Amino acid sequence: LSTQAMDIQTYNAAFGTTNNPWDATKTAGGSSGGSAVAMSAGLSALEAGSDLGGSIRIPSSFCGVFGHRPSFGIVPTRGHVPGPPGTLAAPDLETAGPIARSADDLDLAMRLLAGPDDAHGVAWRLVLPPPRRKGLSEYRLAAWIDDPAAPVDAALRERLEAVIEELRAAGAEVDTEARPGFTLADNARLFMRVLYGSMAAGLPEGQFEKIRARAAALPPEDDSFRARLARDTAQTHRDFDLAREARERRRAQWAELFTRYDALLCPAFPTPAFPHDPSPDFARRALAVNGEPQPYLGTLLGWPALSGLSSLPGTAAPVGFTRDGLPAGIQVVGPFLEDRTAIHVAKLVADVSGGYVRPPGVD
């Protein structure tokens, strides 16, 4: 696990760096990278992770396994760290879910995990509805494979575009023009506002005061990633509530899309596994995508934020390999509370285009 579950790589001072099982020079992803590697290497029958900004879906995609971010609120997260030990309130955006070598195992795990905790179980029960359809040819699928706001690595895009054609050849209906009515850039920006606004309460008082002073001193024209991070962390309660209202409108746009389509296919992350980067300042990190540097925790999170912001289920599925031999993952975004539909579509997609493959050298 990365320190405080706060990175899209996995390393910490106690246990060192977690390598990708397909290429030790590459990251396993994060923050639940150890769980994804354990599944990929066959060390475990089932793993759990948590996912706020992709921490299940990113390592699952990088390591060639299945991972599911549940609909927000259906798997209890009481006791999760962060927040600080002893925190009772569930963090906004945070979910806990399974990582497995098959979609069937994800479905089984969700039947066991989903439901209220002891405090809420006195009054309600949860029964997830079955998948919307039975076979691939019955599903109506939307696909959003690339976007200028979060460019996708050419080798990964090439593989995902091939997956779309493989699905069509297998009888699936896939619409590559369908969108939920907002831009990826706007969604990513709103995600960051909600994310850093919700995390502010968990910061030590001194650190928060420094960030608030830094935000107040920023010139109005500074729209850099570091400036946005400071403003979002120091935002007022009113601004945070406005962001939450904007999120509700975003959810309504998704709900309308899912009256016409059963699920949306998109990248779980815009690149396959990338080289280790342990540099301490996240705000100064950049990841090259097609030769152009992208902010490490900015636009790169646009794809995991698609489901994450709006409380939707998102399932990462392995769909073969890039031309460089790295696992390629696709994300299936499903309707709210229809987790079994997202998982079922992931199973059908992987059956056609990939599925789990044991890494070389793993006995």
Model region roles, listed by residue range:
Residues 69-164, 170, 353-363:
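A short helix-breaking turn/cap at a secondary-structure junction
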Residues 242, 274-301:
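Short, surface-exposed loop/helix-turn segments at secondary-structure junctions
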Residues 256, 293-317:
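Small-aliphatic-rich amphipathic alpha-helix that forms the alpha element of a beta-alpha
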Residues 152-179, 204-215, 240-261:
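Acyltransferase
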Residues 1-113, 309-329:
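Short glycine/serine-rich loop segments
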Residues 135-144, 193-255, 269-280, 318-319, ...:
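Short helix-loop capping/hinge segments that flank enzyme active sites or metal/cofactor-binding pockets
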Residues 238, 342-363:
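Short, gly/Ser/Thr-rich active-site loops of penicillin-recognizing serine hydrolases
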